[in-house]
Amino acid sequence: MPLEMEPKMSKLVFGCQRSSTSDDDSGCALEEYAWVPPGLRPEQIQLYFACLPEEKVPYVNSPGEKHRIKQLLYQLPPHDNEVRYCQSLSEEEKKELQVFSAQRKKEALGRGTIKLLSRAVMHAVCEQCGLQMNGGEVAVFASRAGPGVCWHPSCFVCFTCNELLVDLIYFYQDGKIHCGRHHAELLKPRCSACDEIIFADECTEAEGRHWHMKHFCCLECETVLGGQRYIMKDGRPFCCGCFESLYAEYCETCGEHIGVDHAQMTYDGQHWHATEACFSCAQCKASLLGCPFLPKQGQIYCSKTCSLGEDIHASDSSDSAFQSARSRDSRRSVRMGRSSRSADQCRQSLLLSPALNYKFPGLSGNADDTLSRKLDDVSLASRQGAGFANEEFWKARVEQEASEDPEEWAEHEDYMTQLLLKFGDKNLFQQQSSEVDPRASEHWIPDNMVTNKPEVKPNHQGLASKKYQSDMYWAQSQDGLGDSAYGSHPGPASSRRLQELDLDHGAAGYTHDQSQWYEDSLECLSDLKPEQSIRDSMDSLALSNITGASVDGESKPRPSLYSLQNFEEIEAEDCEKMSNMGTLNSSMLHRSAESLQSLNSGLCPEKILPEEKPAHLPVLRRSKSQSRPQQVKFSDDVIDNGSYDIEIRQPPMSERTRRRAYHFEERGSRPHHHRHRRSRKSRSDNALNLVTERKYSAKDRLRLYTPDNYEKFIQNKSARELQAYMQNANLYSQYAHATSDYALQNPGMNRFLGLCGEDDDSWCSSSTSSSDSEEEGYFLGQPIPQPRPQRFTYYTDDLSSPASALPTPQFTQRTTKSKKKKGHKGKNCIIS
């Protein structure tokens, strides 16, 4: 149709030029336009083109001319009217096309007419924009729309595509004007592949468009995709095979294509199969599905430890401390407001035992030693035979415990590095072979040589244990969680079996013949109830440091390595080495259970063990910046009703505070270990119960102070001692109802008071970790400033700096009436 119009337009232009009464400079030189509306005078043509956008005016060799040609091909497709322009039509389809084209021309085709509105026209309105048109303006009329319908020249556009109708050619349908393309699509579907009208009876409809059946095929291999699976890429269909070969991503782990049917993980332009094997830590191969990860140099890791390329299974306790940078100092000031003890402080006692693997205490640096110890443990298992009926029950409880606070387990490695950077070059972590105890390689003393063996009820539990009964089985250790300071998820690291944990076999010279491995593992926490000792309580504290779980009586009784004769010498030699940061656990110093038992053996006329050389333990000296003041907190969530069966009503679990609790024990048995929320239980209550259950002769028993003889006891004291006692009593007067729970229950505690009463200055000096010897108070060649000893220093629980336990004598135990006020039934003084 446009081809037929070109001669007419040429004739029109030639006629205008021939009939023009003006020369070329009159402004009516029509040869400058590639097309002009037919039937207009030159001045009318100028008025019409003046109403159009400049870029759409078809000047010769202008962008407007190119736009016109483009619109002619788009709005008036030649294959919609002529069979010769169609690619593959059957004879029947060719006939349909001819009929279709003729019908459209007859019923809808038209050309717009340019007219000047008469001055008499007062109410003409543009059909497109709805604005009023005044007389004398140029308007476009469409004969098929009616005589009174008109448009602005710039508003004469297709109803569907809103483009100017090229050369004023329109198709009228249902009161709207359309271009030729969109008018044909109102009647027949158009193939998206060949752009031709579909005259066949069947077609494929996909993605909101239509295709010939044979044209809906893969763009690459031309496989017909009708009824098949396909993938659209840039508006074109592909079969699954071609798409995978052309556009599918490669897995970063296995290097294979990630199929269209396979889920994939994508991060920063990298892709992985969404499987545990592919989307896993590049170092330890732990699955990272659903877990945070640490990207580094194109690889992903579960923790910062793995990102450094270190094998945690092959490292010892010293190596594992090098796994992070010095970021602890920058974060330490931010954490000052926290009152709970952080996980890294609990780990410091483990750091001081090089024989232990930091992450996995069951794995020492010597693989042969580990293997031989395992074999021995297995041989012991055949002789024990009892208490393993609930093995499946223990394993079923593994997944029930919630993970630890991510803020705590994610930070410990930076602090470990800080310790090594400060003290590692001073050989403080090296065990010297010349000081190895010859008895360290021997087994423990047989049970028949143990003196003061306690009598323990086999199925007895204190209130504290009963309270946390549901939480006593498993707790994911902070040491076993992910190490990344960037938010590594604990999931991957928790897959490293906690069953690899043995009890700390290097704490006090005990080596390879410990109780069988299964018995010491976390799968047997309260299955077995053998006889307990003070040493068991201390070991459970160390194990709690490692695993975050409490062990109720799983170790066999272990005798003390120290006697009363060398106790003072050891104390004078090693007390100076203690750190106020809590780097030495009470179970690892001579002021722990060892001191307690040796002190008891001195008080009782019984057999004293031969004097032995103390086991060598490397320690950390305290620098001035590391010492922090002590703190005291009060908590009402732990009451030790261990052996007395006194009815004390407990508040509901939702109303109890989650504080770490300490029971004051005898002198030298002051654990620096705090309970870590619900999953970590201090074993100080065990030691307390054991003290009360020891049997003494009448002459060796210390006097219990009743309200009557207590007054006589006070009168016999010096003025200086009396002042200290009264000052202490005043401080604890408001908690008299809390301490009264132990007034007549705990003879061991009163025995402790009697010891303190004999020398009130001794407990003040021994309760701190400052040096007892002026001559040894040097660090890095500089003398350590000696702080003034303070008997009672109390701070709010704003600071989280660890402090040594302050066993203040509780002389308010005269009060025997226990108050039943809710939430204040029996408070214990705990040290933070």
UniProtKB/Swiss-Prot annotation:
<comment type="function">
    <text>Involved in the planar cell polarity pathway that controls convergent extension during gastrulation and neural tube closure. Convergent extension is a complex morphogenetic process during which cells elongate, move mediolaterally, and intercalate between neighboring cells, leading to convergence toward the mediolateral axis and extension along the anteroposterior axis. Necessary for nuclear localization of REST. May serve as nuclear receptor.</text>
</comment>
<dbReference type="GO" id="GO:0030282">
    <property type="term" value="P:bone mineralization"/>
</dbReference>
<dbReference type="GO" id="GO:0044877">
    <property type="term" value="F:protein-containing complex binding"/>
</dbReference>
<dbReference type="InterPro" id="IPR033726">
    <property type="entry name" value="LIM2_prickle"/>
</dbReference>
<dbReference type="GO" id="GO:0045892">
    <property type="term" value="P:negative regulation of DNA-templated transcription"/>
</dbReference>
<dbReference type="GO" id="GO:0031175">
    <property type="term" value="P:neuron projection development"/>
</dbReference>
<dbReference type="Pfam" id="PF00412">
    <property type="entry name" value="LIM"/>
</dbReference>
<dbReference type="GO" id="GO:0006606">
    <property type="term" value="P:protein import into nucleus"/>
</dbReference>
<dbReference type="GO" id="GO:1990138">
    <property type="term" value="P:neuron projection extension"/>
</dbReference>
<dbReference type="GO" id="GO:0032436">
    <property type="term" value="P:positive regulation of proteasomal ubiquitin-dependent protein catabolic process"/>
</dbReference>
<dbReference type="GO" id="GO:0016020">
    <property type="term" value="C:membrane"/>
</dbReference>
<dbReference type="GO" id="GO:0001894">
    <property type="term" value="P:tissue homeostasis"/>
</dbReference>
<dbReference type="GO" id="GO:0001843">
    <property type="term" value="P:neural tube closure"/>
</dbReference>
<dbReference type="InterPro" id="IPR001781">
    <property type="entry name" value="Znf_LIM"/>
</dbReference>
<dbReference type="GO" id="GO:0005829">
    <property type="term" value="C:cytosol"/>
</dbReference>
<dbReference type="GO" id="GO:0051602">
    <property type="term" value="P:response to electrical stimulus"/>
</dbReference>
<dbReference type="GO" id="GO:0035108">
    <property type="term" value="P:limb morphogenesis"/>
</dbReference>
<dbReference type="GO" id="GO:0007507">
    <property type="term" value="P:heart development"/>
</dbReference>
<protein>
    <recommendedName>
        <fullName>Prickle-like protein 1</fullName>
    </recommendedName>
</protein>
<dbReference type="GO" id="GO:0060071">
    <property type="term" value="P:Wnt signaling pathway, planar cell polarity pathway"/>
</dbReference>
<dbReference type="GO" id="GO:0098609">
    <property type="term" value="P:cell-cell adhesion"/>
</dbReference>
<keyword id="KW-0449">Lipoprotein</keyword>
<keyword id="KW-0597">Phosphoprotein</keyword>
<dbReference type="GO" id="GO:0061865">
    <property type="term" value="P:polarized secretion of basement membrane proteins in epithelium"/>
</dbReference>
<dbReference type="GO" id="GO:0055013">
    <property type="term" value="P:cardiac muscle cell development"/>
</dbReference>
<dbReference type="GO" id="GO:0070075">
    <property type="term" value="P:tear secretion"/>
</dbReference>
<dbReference type="GO" id="GO:0035880">
    <property type="term" value="P:embryonic nail plate morphogenesis"/>
</dbReference>
<keyword id="KW-0862">Zinc</keyword>
<dbReference type="GO" id="GO:0060325">
    <property type="term" value="P:face morphogenesis"/>
</dbReference>
<dbReference type="GO" id="GO:0098978">
    <property type="term" value="C:glutamatergic synapse"/>
</dbReference>
<dbReference type="GO" id="GO:0061303">
    <property type="term" value="P:cornea development in camera-type eye"/>
</dbReference>
<dbReference type="GO" id="GO:0009410">
    <property type="term" value="P:response to xenobiotic stimulus"/>
</dbReference>
<comment type="subunit">
    <text>Interacts with REST.</text>
</comment>
<feature type="modified residue" description="Phosphoserine">
    <location>
        <position position="592"/>
    </location>
</feature>
<keyword id="KW-0472">Membrane</keyword>
<dbReference type="GO" id="GO:2000691">
    <property type="term" value="P:negative regulation of cardiac muscle cell myoblast differentiation"/>
</dbReference>
<keyword id="KW-0636">Prenylation</keyword>
<dbReference type="GO" id="GO:0005634">
    <property type="term" value="C:nucleus"/>
</dbReference>
<dbReference type="GO" id="GO:0030326">
    <property type="term" value="P:embryonic limb morphogenesis"/>
</dbReference>
<dbReference type="GO" id="GO:0030705">
    <property type="term" value="P:cytoskeleton-dependent intracellular transport"/>
</dbReference>
<dbReference type="GO" id="GO:0061029">
    <property type="term" value="P:eyelid development in camera-type eye"/>
</dbReference>
<dbReference type="GO" id="GO:0007010">
    <property type="term" value="P:cytoskeleton organization"/>
</dbReference>
